UniProtKB/Swiss-Prot annotation:
Protein name: Triosephosphate isomerase
CDD domains associated with the record: TIM
Taxonomic source organism: Onion yellows phytoplasma (strain OY-M)
Gene this chain is encoded by: tpiA
Keyword ATP-binding attributed: no
Pathway where it operates: Carbohydrate biosynthesis; gluconeogenesis; Carbohydrate degradation; glycolysis; D-glyceraldehyde 3-phosphate from glycerone phosphate: step 1/1
Protein backbone atom coordinates (compact mmCIF):
# COMPACT_ATOMS: atom_id res chain seq x y z
CA UNK A 1 0.00 0.00 0.00
CA UNK A 2 1.39 3.43 -0.96
CA UNK A 3 1.12 6.28 1.54
CA UNK A 4 1.49 10.01 0.95
CA UNK A 5 3.61 12.28 3.16
CA UNK A 6 1.63 14.14 5.82
CA UNK A 7 0.80 17.68 4.70
CA UNK A 8 0.06 20.28 7.38
CA UNK A 9 -3.61 21.26 7.72
CA UNK A 10 -4.96 24.69 8.61
CA UNK A 11 -8.73 24.42 8.96
CA UNK A 12 -11.30 26.97 10.08
CA UNK A 13 -14.69 26.06 11.52
CA UNK A 14 -16.87 29.13 11.07
CA UNK A 15 -19.73 27.63 13.09
CA UNK A 16 -22.80 29.92 12.74
CA UNK A 17 -20.87 33.07 11.85
CA UNK A 18 -20.55 35.16 8.66
CA UNK A 19 -23.24 36.03 6.15
CA UNK A 20 -22.80 35.73 2.40
CA UNK A 21 -21.13 39.05 1.57
CA UNK A 22 -18.47 38.88 4.29
CA UNK A 23 -17.86 35.21 3.57
CA UNK A 24 -17.29 35.91 -0.12
CA UNK A 25 -14.93 38.76 0.72
CA UNK A 26 -12.94 36.46 3.03
CA UNK A 27 -12.61 33.68 0.45
CA UNK A 28 -11.64 36.09 -2.34
CA UNK A 29 -8.85 37.58 -0.22
CA UNK A 30 -7.55 34.40 1.34
CA UNK A 31 -7.58 32.20 -1.75
CA UNK A 32 -5.08 34.54 -3.42
CA UNK A 33 -2.65 34.53 -0.49
CA UNK A 34 -2.64 31.10 1.15
CA UNK A 35 0.38 28.84 0.54
CA UNK A 36 0.43 26.15 -2.11
CA UNK A 37 -1.47 23.00 -1.15
CA UNK A 38 1.69 20.94 -1.52
CA UNK A 39 2.98 22.82 1.54
CA UNK A 40 -0.18 23.39 3.57
CA UNK A 41 -3.78 22.27 3.08
CA UNK A 42 -6.16 25.10 3.95
CA UNK A 43 -9.84 24.39 4.62
CA UNK A 44 -12.85 26.47 5.61
CA UNK A 45 -16.04 24.94 7.03
CA UNK A 46 -18.80 27.60 6.62
CA UNK A 47 -22.53 27.41 7.25
CA UNK A 48 -24.53 25.20 4.91
CA UNK A 49 -26.22 28.15 3.19
CA UNK A 50 -22.83 29.49 2.07
CA UNK A 51 -21.51 26.31 0.49
CA UNK A 52 -22.87 26.84 -3.01
CA UNK A 53 -21.44 30.35 -3.37
CA UNK A 54 -18.11 29.62 -1.69
CA UNK A 55 -17.49 26.29 -3.40
CA UNK A 56 -17.55 28.09 -6.75
CA UNK A 57 -14.75 30.39 -5.57
CA UNK A 58 -12.52 27.82 -3.95
CA UNK A 59 -9.18 27.34 -5.67
CA UNK A 60 -6.53 24.69 -5.54
CA UNK A 61 -4.98 26.44 -2.54
CA UNK A 62 -8.18 26.83 -0.49
CA UNK A 63 -11.00 24.34 -0.14
CA UNK A 64 -14.45 24.54 1.39
CA UNK A 65 -16.13 21.83 3.46
CA UNK A 66 -19.46 21.22 5.16
CA UNK A 67 -19.86 21.37 8.94
CA UNK A 68 -22.08 18.29 8.96
CA UNK A 69 -23.97 15.78 6.81
CA UNK A 70 -26.44 12.94 7.21
CA UNK A 71 -25.45 9.34 6.59
CA UNK A 72 -28.24 8.48 4.13
CA UNK A 73 -27.96 9.38 0.44
CA UNK A 74 -31.53 10.69 0.26
CA UNK A 75 -34.90 10.36 1.94
CA UNK A 76 -37.41 11.90 4.34
CA UNK A 77 -34.92 13.46 6.76
CA UNK A 78 -36.13 17.02 7.27
CA UNK A 79 -33.40 19.55 7.97
CA UNK A 80 -30.52 17.29 6.97
CA UNK A 81 -28.12 17.44 4.01
CA UNK A 82 -26.99 14.41 2.04
CA UNK A 83 -23.46 13.55 0.93
CA UNK A 84 -24.70 13.52 -2.66
CA UNK A 85 -25.95 17.08 -2.25
CA UNK A 86 -22.54 18.20 -1.01
CA UNK A 87 -20.82 16.57 -3.95
CA UNK A 88 -23.21 18.27 -6.38
CA UNK A 89 -22.03 21.63 -5.00
CA UNK A 90 -18.39 20.77 -5.56
CA UNK A 91 -17.76 20.20 -1.84
CA UNK A 92 -15.19 17.49 -1.08
CA UNK A 93 -14.63 17.91 2.67
CA UNK A 94 -16.92 17.41 5.65
CA UNK A 95 -16.52 17.97 9.40
CA UNK A 96 -17.95 15.16 11.52
CA UNK A 97 -18.62 14.71 15.23
CA UNK A 98 -17.79 18.19 16.47
CA UNK A 99 -18.40 18.52 20.21
CA UNK A 100 -21.14 21.10 19.62
CA UNK A 101 -23.00 18.58 17.46
CA UNK A 102 -22.79 16.13 20.34
CA UNK A 103 -23.74 18.65 23.04
CA UNK A 104 -26.63 20.41 21.31
CA UNK A 105 -27.92 17.79 18.86
CA UNK A 106 -27.33 14.50 20.65
CA UNK A 107 -24.83 12.97 18.25
CA UNK A 108 -23.05 9.86 19.53
CA UNK A 109 -20.02 7.82 18.52
CA UNK A 110 -22.38 5.51 16.67
CA UNK A 111 -23.92 8.40 14.73
CA UNK A 112 -20.48 9.70 13.82
CA UNK A 113 -19.44 6.21 12.72
CA UNK A 114 -22.39 6.00 10.32
CA UNK A 115 -21.54 9.43 8.92
CA UNK A 116 -17.88 8.52 8.54
CA UNK A 117 -18.69 5.35 6.63
CA UNK A 118 -21.11 7.27 4.40
CA UNK A 119 -18.57 10.03 3.73
CA UNK A 120 -15.97 7.48 2.67
CA UNK A 121 -18.51 5.66 0.49
CA UNK A 122 -19.24 8.92 -1.34
CA UNK A 123 -15.53 9.84 -1.70
CA UNK A 124 -15.73 12.80 0.66
CA UNK A 125 -12.73 13.67 2.85
CA UNK A 126 -13.86 13.63 6.50
CA UNK A 127 -12.34 15.53 9.39
CA UNK A 128 -13.45 13.55 12.44
CA UNK A 129 -13.51 15.23 15.85
CA UNK A 130 -12.67 13.43 19.08
CA UNK A 131 -12.09 14.76 22.57
CA UNK A 132 -12.75 14.40 26.27
CA UNK A 133 -14.80 16.40 28.77
CA UNK A 134 -13.32 18.32 31.69
CA UNK A 135 -14.59 15.67 34.13
CA UNK A 136 -12.89 12.92 32.14
CA UNK A 137 -9.66 14.90 32.11
CA UNK A 138 -9.81 15.61 35.85
CA UNK A 139 -10.35 11.90 36.54
CA UNK A 140 -7.25 11.06 34.48
CA UNK A 141 -9.35 9.02 32.06
CA UNK A 142 -8.49 10.86 28.84
CA UNK A 143 -6.64 7.98 27.20
CA UNK A 144 -9.24 5.38 28.20
CA UNK A 145 -12.04 7.59 26.90
CA UNK A 146 -10.34 8.39 23.59
CA UNK A 147 -9.38 4.75 23.02
CA UNK A 148 -13.05 3.76 23.28
CA UNK A 149 -14.20 6.72 21.21
CA UNK A 150 -11.81 5.82 18.40
CA UNK A 151 -12.81 2.16 18.55
CA UNK A 152 -16.48 3.14 18.20
CA UNK A 153 -16.04 5.73 15.47
CA UNK A 154 -13.70 3.69 13.28
CA UNK A 155 -15.70 0.46 13.40
CA UNK A 156 -15.88 -0.94 9.88
CA UNK A 157 -13.48 1.63 8.40
CA UNK A 158 -10.91 -0.09 6.15
CA UNK A 159 -7.21 0.58 6.63
CA UNK A 160 -6.72 1.96 3.13
CA UNK A 161 -9.15 4.80 3.96
CA UNK A 162 -7.06 6.20 6.80
CA UNK A 163 -4.80 8.43 4.70
CA UNK A 164 -7.94 10.22 3.46
CA UNK A 165 -9.25 10.88 6.98
CA UNK A 166 -8.18 13.72 9.26
CA UNK A 167 -8.64 13.36 13.02
CA UNK A 168 -9.16 16.58 14.96
CA UNK A 169 -8.40 16.29 18.67
CA UNK A 170 -10.59 18.91 20.31
CA UNK A 171 -10.83 18.61 24.09
CA UNK A 172 -14.42 19.58 24.88
CA UNK A 173 -13.33 21.70 27.82
CA UNK A 174 -11.23 23.89 25.49
CA UNK A 175 -13.87 24.64 22.84
CA UNK A 176 -14.90 28.29 22.90
CA UNK A 177 -13.79 28.70 26.50
CA UNK A 178 -10.52 30.52 25.99
CA UNK A 179 -8.83 27.62 27.74
CA UNK A 180 -6.39 25.51 25.80
CA UNK A 181 -4.40 22.38 26.41
CA UNK A 182 -0.73 23.25 26.54
CA UNK A 183 0.93 22.43 23.22
CA UNK A 184 2.99 19.79 25.00
CA UNK A 185 -0.11 18.16 26.54
CA UNK A 186 -1.92 18.24 23.20
CA UNK A 187 1.11 16.65 21.57
CA UNK A 188 1.10 13.85 24.16
CA UNK A 189 -2.59 13.11 23.65
CA UNK A 190 -2.20 13.11 19.87
CA UNK A 191 0.66 10.63 20.23
CA UNK A 192 -1.73 8.43 22.24
CA UNK A 193 -4.39 8.78 19.54
CA UNK A 194 -1.89 7.68 16.90
CA UNK A 195 -0.87 4.74 19.11
CA UNK A 196 -4.52 3.66 19.29
CA UNK A 197 -4.91 3.90 15.52
CA UNK A 198 -1.77 1.75 15.25
CA UNK A 199 -3.37 -0.82 17.55
CA UNK A 200 -6.55 -0.82 15.46
CA UNK A 201 -4.73 -0.97 12.11
CA UNK A 202 -0.95 -0.73 11.63
CA UNK A 203 1.91 1.65 12.39
CA UNK A 204 2.36 2.46 8.71
CA UNK A 205 -1.29 3.39 8.30
CA UNK A 206 -1.42 5.46 11.49
CA UNK A 207 1.76 7.31 10.59
CA UNK A 208 0.25 8.34 7.26
CA UNK A 209 -2.86 9.72 8.97
CA UNK A 210 -3.05 13.40 9.83
CA UNK A 211 -4.07 14.36 13.37
CA UNK A 212 -4.67 18.02 14.14
CA UNK A 213 -5.51 20.03 17.25
CA UNK A 214 -8.53 22.24 17.92
CA UNK A 215 -9.25 24.15 21.09
CA UNK A 216 -8.83 27.91 21.57
CA UNK A 217 -6.14 28.19 18.91
CA UNK A 218 -4.87 31.76 18.57
CA UNK A 219 -2.20 33.93 16.98
CA UNK A 220 -0.40 33.81 20.32
CA UNK A 221 -0.09 30.01 20.52
CA UNK A 222 -0.15 28.83 16.89
CA UNK A 223 3.63 28.71 16.44
CA UNK A 224 4.20 26.61 19.55
CA UNK A 225 1.33 24.28 18.66
CA UNK A 226 2.66 23.62 15.17
CA UNK A 227 6.18 23.07 16.51
CA UNK A 228 4.98 19.94 18.31
CA UNK A 229 6.17 16.90 16.33
CA UNK A 230 2.94 14.89 16.58
CA UNK A 231 0.57 17.73 15.63
CA UNK A 232 -0.18 17.97 11.91
CA UNK A 233 -2.17 21.19 11.97
CA UNK A 234 -5.08 22.96 13.60
CA UNK A 235 -8.86 23.28 13.53
CA UNK A 236 -9.57 26.86 14.61
CA UNK A 237 -12.97 28.24 15.57
CA UNK A 238 -13.52 31.97 16.06
CA UNK A 239 -9.82 32.58 15.41
CA UNK A 240 -10.39 31.56 11.79
CA UNK A 241 -12.96 34.29 11.15
CA UNK A 242 -10.40 37.04 10.64
CA UNK A 243 -8.59 37.10 7.30
CA UNK A 244 -5.29 38.22 8.79
CA UNK A 245 -5.32 35.58 11.52
CA UNK A 246 -6.16 32.72 9.16
CA UNK A 247 -3.42 33.77 6.76
CA UNK A 248 -0.99 34.04 9.68
CA UNK A 249 -1.81 30.46 10.69
CA UNK A 250 -1.21 29.27 7.12
CA UNK A 251 2.06 31.17 6.78
CA UNK A 252 3.44 29.73 10.03
CA UNK A 253 2.48 26.24 8.88
CA UNK A 254 4.10 26.83 5.50
CA UNK A 255 7.38 27.96 7.05
CA UNK A 256 7.48 24.93 9.32
CA UNK A 257 6.58 22.59 6.45
CA UNK A 258 9.45 23.93 4.35
CA UNK A 259 11.86 23.58 7.28
CA UNK A 260 10.68 20.01 7.92
CA UNK A 261 11.09 19.08 4.27
CA UNK A 262 14.65 20.37 4.33
CA UNK A 263 15.39 18.29 7.45
CA UNK A 264 13.87 15.17 5.87
CA UNK A 265 16.09 15.40 2.80
CA UNK A 266 19.16 16.09 4.92
CA UNK A 267 18.45 13.12 7.19
CA UNK A 268 16.93 10.90 4.49
CA UNK A 269 14.00 10.21 6.83
CA UNK A 270 10.65 8.69 5.90
CA UNK A 271 8.30 11.68 5.27
CA UNK A 272 5.47 10.22 7.32
CA UNK A 273 7.32 8.47 10.12
CA UNK A 274 5.94 9.10 13.59
Amino acid sequence: MNYKPRTKVIAGNWKMYKCKDEALEFIQKVSLQVPDQTQVQTLIFPQLTLLDSLAQLQGTNLQVGAQNMFYESEGAFTGEVSPQNLLSLGVKHVLLGHSERRTFFGETDQTVNLKLLSALKHKLVPTVCVGESLLTKENNQTQVFLDQQLTNIFAGVPEEALQNIIIAYEPVWAIGTGKSATPQDANKVIEQIRDKVTALYSSQASCAMRIIYGGSVSVANIKTILEQPAIDGILAGKASLQTEDFLFFAQIASKQALASTKDIFQKNDCPFCC
